[in-house]
Amino acid sequence: MSLRIVFLGSPTFAVLPLERLVADSRYQVVGVVTQPDRPAGRGKMPVATPVKQAALRLGLPVLTPETLRDPAAVADLADLRPDVGVVAAYGEILRRDVLAIPPLGYVNIHPSLLPLYRGPSPVAGAILNGDAETGVTIMVIEAKMDAGPILAQRVVPLPPDARTGSLTRELFAIGADMLLETLDAYATGAITPHPQDHARATFTKLLSREDGIIDWSQPALRIERMTRAYDPWPGATTTWRGAPLKIIAARVRSDRHSDAPPGTLLDTAEGLAVATGDGLLVLETVQPAGKRPLPAADWRRGVRLTGGERLGG
C-alpha cells in the first residue's frame, strides 16, 4: 500500500522533489500545499508558484491558503488524511496543530549540514563564509525552526565560484534523490531519527534588500562572496553617479592595494577595479539600473569615467 503524502513547497527548486515522489510507486501524493498566486511582472497579474503549476500539470489537488494559521486551511489539510508530509521550501513555519496531522509528521529537505545554517538562507550563508563544503539534510520537522532530528545527510563540496541560485538547485536535486529512499526507510522503521547537536547550531536570517548593499570599506574577498551569495536575491548592489549598479561578477586581487579611498574606480592592467578596505576587486560583469548585465569593460567604455570617481558615494 502506497504511503499517503502531502507535499508542501513553492519555488522552482521544489518542483523536482514533487515530480520524483509522484513517479515513485511507493508513494501517493494526495495533495499539494503551496503559497497563493502573487502579482508579478509589469502587469502585476497573479502568477502561480512553480509548485502549483507542476501540481496542476500532474493532476494533483492543490491548496493555496494565505496562511496555515487559518483553521479552515488546517481542516482542509487534515481532510487529505496524509501519512506523512514532505516540505521543500514551503515559505511558512508550521505550527503544532499542523504538525500533528500526519501520523509520521513532516520530513524536510534542508540545504545545509544541520545544525549549521538553520533558517531561511543557508546556501547564502555558506557561500558568504567561504565554506569548503555544504550539504543536504533530511530531517523531521519540530515546532522549533530546523531543530528536529536528522534522518540522513550528504556532504557536497562547495566550489569557489558557487552562486546561491545554481547551488540551491543542485542541493535540492540531491535532496530529491535522498528523500525517496529516506522516506521509505523512515516509514518502515528501518532508520531512526537522531537528535541534532544543538550546541553547534548556527543561524541565518531572511535576506533583505539592505543586505546586498556593498560597503566598500570591507575586504575585497568579502565583497566578491556577496556577488555570489546574494545571487539572485538581493544582489550585490552599489550606486554610481546616484543610480543603482549591481555587481554581478568580480575577482579578488588581495595582493594589490591602492591608497585611493574605498569605492574608487581604478583602471588597471587587469581591467576596471575598485579600491576596497583590503585588496582590489576587479569587476567582470555589472548591471546598470534598467539594463541587462554586460561586461565591465563594455560598461567602462560606454560611461566615460573621469579620474577619481567612486562607487557608493
Swiss-Prot record:
Query: Does the entry feature the keyword Nucleotidyltransferase, yes or no?
Result: no
Q: What does the record give as the reaction this protein catalyses?
A: L-methionyl-tRNA(fMet) + (6R)-10-formyltetrahydrofolate = N-formyl-L-methionyl-tRNA(fMet) + (6S)-5,6,7,8-tetrahydrofolate + H(+)
The enzyme class is transferase
Which residues does (6S)-5,6,7,8-tetrahydrofolate bind? 112-115
Say yes or no: keyword Thylakoid present.
no
In which domain of life is the source organism classified?
Bacteria
Kindly give the SUPFAM superfamilies that the UniProt entry links to this protein: FMT C-terminal domain-like, Formyltransferase
Q: Which residues form a coiled coil?
A: none
Q: Record's InterPro entries?
A: Fmt, Formyl_trans_C, Formyl_transf_N, Formyl_transf_N_sf, Formyl_transferase-like_C_sf, Met-tRNA-FMT_C, Met-tRNA-FMT_N
* Record keywords: Protein biosynthesis, Transferase
Could you cite one Gene Ontology molecular function of this protein?
methionyl-tRNA formyltransferase activity
Give the HAMAP family listed for this entry: Formyl_trans
Function, as annotated: Attaches a formyl group to the free amino group of methionyl-tRNA(fMet). The formyl group appears to play a dual role in the initiator identity of N-formylmethionyl-tRNA by promoting its recognition by IF2 and preventing the misappropriation of this tRNA by the elongation apparatus.
Q: What is this protein called?
A: Methionyl-tRNA formyltransferase
Q: Which organism is it from?
A: Roseiflexus castenholzii (strain DSM 13941 / HLO8)
